[in-house]
Every structure is written in C-alpha cells, then in structure tokens.
C-alpha cells in the first residue's frame, strides 16, 4: 500500500487532550471554516493512513472544539491521540474565495519585492496568533521573516508561483 501524499491533505487542528471518559477529544481548530468541517464525515489523525468517522464536532470555547470519533470510545484511546494533528482531504475543503488560499500552498513559492527583486523561496509558515509569518530562504543568506499582513504582502499568485511583498527595507531592520 502506498503512503498517502501529504499534499492531498490540509491541517485543520491539533488534538490537545482527552475529554470525559467516553473517548471525546479536545481539538484546537486552526481552520478558518470550522463550520464546514462539522458537516464532514471523516477526519484523518496522525499518519493519515486511516480515516476516522466524525460522530460529532462542536465548539467548546473559542477555537477549542469537542470532537467525537466513532472509532475512539475510551479515555485511554483518546489520551493516546493527544498532540496529534488532524487533517481533512483537500477535496473535502470548503471552496476558497478569490482572495483566499491554503497556507500549505505558499510553501515553495518564489518571493519578490514590488520592484522585482528576488528575496528567496517560502519555506515555512509560522503561526503566531496575531498574524502568520512567512519564512523566506535564499541560499547563503539568513532567513527573512515576512509578516503575512496586507501592508507587507502585496499579492499572492499561486498559479504563477510568486508572492510579492513591499521593499526589503520595509521588512528587514537595518
């Protein structure tokens, strides 16, 4: 059996703890469309090899949700899942608006300034809470951290493979 292709899946949350004695899980949702995930029938946890059937998913507090997976019915089984990441198949994702994108799709894009200066390639997204930060790497140079805010990131062209940002002077302190 072939291992699942990571690119076919989207990270939607992280299991933070067991809840109760019947196998419910606390999950920190990182999806901007948790209401869409509530309508889905399956979720992949951990190594992506096995789908779990969603019995119930509802908001608990803020971005914390309670998740019931039909295959997880004891506290011990739920505790064994603590710290694992939860994914949905890309084909199950909510449709994106024109100005929306999956963070995962930014990794690998070329980053340039509005003047056309090559800054490097996006290698990682750091989720900070206030705003995401794009890590840009160019061979032989220190990584550049680019805040993912409209005043800095001018455009994202997934199809064209580029992210355009303001000038380097606006991003990198001297």
From Swiss-Prot:
One record GO biological process: ribosomal small subunit biogenesis
Chaperone keyword on record: yes
Keywords: Chaperone, Cytoplasm, Ribosome biogenesis, rRNA processing
GO molecular function annotation: ribosome binding
UniProt feature coiled coil, ranges: none
Chaperone is among the record's keywords: yes
Gene Ontology CC: one annotated term: ribosome
Domain of life (superkingdom): Bacteria
Residue stretches making up the PRC barrel domain: 98-171
Location in the cell: Cytoplasm
One Pfam family cited in the UniProt record for this chain: RimM
Main location: cytoplasm
InterPro entries: PRC_barrel-like_sf (IPR011033), PRC_RimM (IPR056792), RimM (IPR011961), RimM_N (IPR002676), RimM_N_sf (IPR036976), Transl_B-barrel_sf (IPR009000)
Function of the protein: An accessory protein needed during the final step in the assembly of 30S ribosomal subunit, possibly for assembly of the head region. Essential for efficient processing of 16S rRNA. May be needed both before and after RbfA during the maturation of 16S rRNA. It has affinity for free ribosomal 30S subunits but not for 70S ribosomes.
Written domain comment of the UniProt record: The PRC barrel domain binds ribosomal protein uS19.
PANTHER family xrefs: RIBOSOME MATURATION FACTOR RIMM
Protein family (similarity comment): Belongs to the RimM family.
Subunit structure: Binds ribosomal protein uS19.
This protein's name: Ribosome maturation factor RimM
Underlying gene: rimM
């Amino acid at each position: 059996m072939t291992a699942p292709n990571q690119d076919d899946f989207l990270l939607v949350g992280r299991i933070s703890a067991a809840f109760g004695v019947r196998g419910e899980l606390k999950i920190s949702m990182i999806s901007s469309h948790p209401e869409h995930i509530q309508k889905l029938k399956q979720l992949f946890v951990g190594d992506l090899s096995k789908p779990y059937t969603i019995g119930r998913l509802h908001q608990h507090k803020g971005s914390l949700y309670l998740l019931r997976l039909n295959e997880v019915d004891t506290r011990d089984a739920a505790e064994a899942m603590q710290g694992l990441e939860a994914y949905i198949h890309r084909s199950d994702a909510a449709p994106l608006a024109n100005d929306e994108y999956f963070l995962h799709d930014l990794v690998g894009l070329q980053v340039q300034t509005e003047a056309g200066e090559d800054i490097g390639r996006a290698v990682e997204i750091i989720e900070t809470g206030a705003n995401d930060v794009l890590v840009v790497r160019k061979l032989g140079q220190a990584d550049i951290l680019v805040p993912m805010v409209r005043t800095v990131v001018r455009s994202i062209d997934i199809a064209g493979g580029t992210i355009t940002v303001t000038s380097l002077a606006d991003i990198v302190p001297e």
